[in-house]
Amino acid sequence: MLYTYAGPEISVATTKAYSTQLIGTYMLAICLGKARGLIDEREEQRLLAEIAALPEKVQRIIDDKERLQWFAAKFSNAKDVFFIGRGIDYAICMEGSLKMKEISYIHSEAYAAGELKHGTISLIEDGTLVIGVLTQSELYEKTLSNLVEVK
């Protein structure tokens, strides 16, 4: 059993539990990679530094209230929200879509960017908010190309 020490969850969207599970899994992956000789000391330190930088990055997003309020006002009438991503970003899209439904009660779906041409693109109407998740540099251009298609 891997304890995350998240403490009691008080949010319907379980953001704290989800976030700590991700960090716990990431830490476990680092330890396993090191134990198997797939990650050296330098790479381990780089990955741990990324984790240590997360609180500051999250705080910058929280502090950007003006921009967040602008986005919320601009898209507050959206009836549908689609999250689009490839690879591991698709998993992030599924969680983002779930959070959107749980918190805002707006219809939301997650789609693999490569599957848009197979009928999904026809569901995107005027006023649909499409959120692209692009965290993998090797898939950036392909995903961006898919997002341009839905514009």
Task: Show the residue positions of the predicted features.
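A SIS-like phosphosugar-recognition module
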Residues: 1-151
